[in-house]
Structures are given as structure tokens and as C-alpha cells.
Design a protein with these regions (language model features):
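Hydrophobic alpha-helical transmembrane segments of multi-pass membrane transport proteins
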Residues: 18-22, 26, 77-94, 156-167, ...
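Structural motif at transmembrane-helix junctions in multi-pass transporters
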Residues: 32-37, 88-105, 228-245, 264
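Glycine-/small-residue-enriched transmembrane alpha-helix faces in small-molecule transporters
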Residues: 1-37, 141-170, 192, 256, ...
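Hydrophobic transmembrane alpha-helices of multi-pass small-molecule transport proteins
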Residues: 128-144, 157, 268-287
Length: 295
């Protein structure tokens, strides 16, 4: 892998995780729109955006291959439900002053990925990975025991996205085709909800100001652009290298929540964050050690 490819991959990875990290600022701009409606716009406009991208890149043969494989279509139906639920929970959390907990979910996610890899893919834990996962578990249990609360939103986001990643890994479909089929599965539900069920001051596009409609349509761009950057990075970087960028997103979310949106982290959250951050430091140092040994 040459230096130019690596540099391009790093820039694409930075772009992907930067956009994911500041995405809450976009959702805050339209926080007066119900989360369910924002989700429908995210699905609808992502579908049309992906249609345009696949047409421009002439990748319809990939779509036909997937459509002709019932197992992959069924797998993408399940992944569509998971990613749809993840999107809805994330939008609701951001627009109801739970951005800190959303960031916690994406800090926890890499550790959940490791657990699912062991349970479903037969991957073996290294000793320090066990320590990291146990440390994260302790953080959640301490919050439950001491403060009588569970980070439900964080756990929901972490596990839904981890299971989504597991299914996508199992069915092995490229990112563009996968997102097109997933949004196609969700499209009828989104259309029925938006045009037949939703009743709110913003549910009728013809009555909205054009500026709001443009922001709602931008949901497709906010969804697909970082995904394409991530896919481009994944093809140019080692997976172990790419993994170190994944903490940019939740770190930016945490900073946005505290500095710009006035979410004060209470003692319960800070205790949990402390355990999770310690677990992630152990996790990253272990990965660096293994990477150096392989070299």
C-alpha cells in the first residue's frame, strides 16, 4: 500500500468521522421537527441520493447480484430494521438533550463489537481485551448500583449499531448497494408515516418554508457522504489503522454537548465515562502492542 493511498485513506477517514461527530449540530437545526419525521426524511432522501450515486458510478450490476440472492435480501431487511432503530434513537437523543449519552453509546460500541466477534464469529479475546470489556461493564454496573440508573440510550445505540455491523459483515455486501437496499426496505414505511400518518406543523412539505425543506432533504447527504468517505478509507487503510479513527466521532459529540449545548455531565455519567475511557485506553494500547509485534 503506497504512501499516497495511505494519505488519501487517512483524509477520507478523518472526513467520515468528523461529519459523524458534528452531525448532531445538523439535527439540532431541525429539532422542532418530530424525530419520527426526521427519520422518514433521512430514509427517503438517502434512498434517492444512493440511486443517483449508483447510477453515476454504474454499479447497478452489483445491485442485481444482491437482489438475486434471497439470503442477502433477508439479511439487509434485518439490518435495515436495526439501522432504522439506531437512527431514530440517535435523532431523539440529540434533540431531547441526551447528546452526552449518545456519545457514550459510540464510545461503548467498539467494545461491544469485540464481544459480538467472540460470540458469533469465534474470535478469541486477548487478555487485555478481557480487561477492557470488564472495565466497561463495571462502569455500567456502578452507575446502576450507585445511582440507580442505566444508560439505556447509550446501550441501545451501542448494541443496535454493533449488531448492524455484525449482520453487514456476515452478508458481505458493499456499502453503497447495502444502503440502497436497506433504505428501499424502509421506504414504504417512511412514506406511509410521512404522507399518511404524521400530523404536525412540519409534516406537510408544501406548507413548510423552502429553507426547512432543504434542511430535511439534506438528511440524505448527512447520511450518505460520511458513509462513502468511510468506504473509501476502508479500501485504502488497514482495518487496525482505521479503528483508531472511530473515537473522533463520539469525542466531537461529547465536546458539542458540553461546550455548545450546555449538557452538564452529572456524577453518574462521569463515573461511567471514566470507566469507559479507561477501558478504551487499554483497548487501544493492546491493539498498538499487537500491531507492533506483527511488524
Amino acid at each position: 500500500m503506497d504512501a499516497k493511498q495511505t494519505r488519501t485513506g487517512i483524509l477520507l477517514a478523518l472526513a467520515a468521522y468528523f461529519i459523524w461527530g458534528i452531525a448532531p449540530a445538523y439535527f439540532k437545526l431541525i429539532q422542532y421537527v418530530p424525530a419520527s419525521e426526521i427519520l422518514t426524511h433521512r430514509v427517503i432522501w438517502s434512498f434517492f441520493f444512493m440511486m443517483a450515486l449508483i447510477s453515476l458510478s454504474r454499479q447497478w450490476h452489483q445491485v442485481r447480484k444482491v437482489v438475486a440472492t434471497p439470503r442477502k435480501i433477508a439479511g439487509l431487511a434485518l439490518s435495515a430494521v436495526l439501522v432504522g432503530g439506531n437512527w431514530l434513537l440517535f435523532i431523539w437523543a440529540v434533540n431531547n438533550h441526551h447528546m452526552l449519552e449518545a456519545s457514550l453509546g459510540y464510545f461503548i460500541n467498539p467494545l461491544v463489537n469485540v464481544v459480538l466477534g467472540m460470540v458469533f464469529l469465534g474470535e478469541r479475546f486477548r487478555r487485555m481485551q478481557w480487561v477492557a470489556v470488564l472495565m466497561a461493564t463495571c462502569g455500567v454496573l456502578v452507575q446502576l448500583w450507585t445511582f440507580g440508573s442505566l444508560p439505556i440510550i447509550a446501550l441501545g445505540l451501542a448494541f443496535s449499531f454493533a449488531f448492524y455491523g455484525l449482520i453487514r459483515k456476515k452478508i458481505a455486501v458493499d456499502a453503497q448497494t447495502g444502503m440502497l437496499v436497506e433504505t428501499l426496505w424502509l421506504l414504504p414505511v417512511a412514506a406511509i408515516w410521512l404522507f399518511g400518518i404524521a400530523v404536525s406543523p412540519t409534516s406537510h412539505l408544501s406548507q413548510n418554508p423552502w429553507s426547512l425543506n432543504l434542511l430535511l432533504m439534506a438528511a440524505g447527504v448527512v447520511t450518505t457522504i460520511p458513509l462513502l468517505c468511510f468506504t473509501g478509507a476502508a479500501t485504502r487503510l488497514r482495518l487496525s489503522t482505521l479503528g483508531f479513527f472511530q473515537y473522533i466521532g463520539p469525542t466531537l459529540m461529547f465536546l458539542l454537548a458540553v461546550i455548545f449545548y450546555g449538557e452538564a455531565p452529572g456524577m453518574d455519567k462521569m463515573v461511567t465515562f471514566g470507566f469507559i475511557w479507561t477501558a478504551l485506553i487499554i483497548f487501544v494500547l493492546d491493539a498498538l502492542y499487537i500491531q507492533r509485534r506483527v511488524r
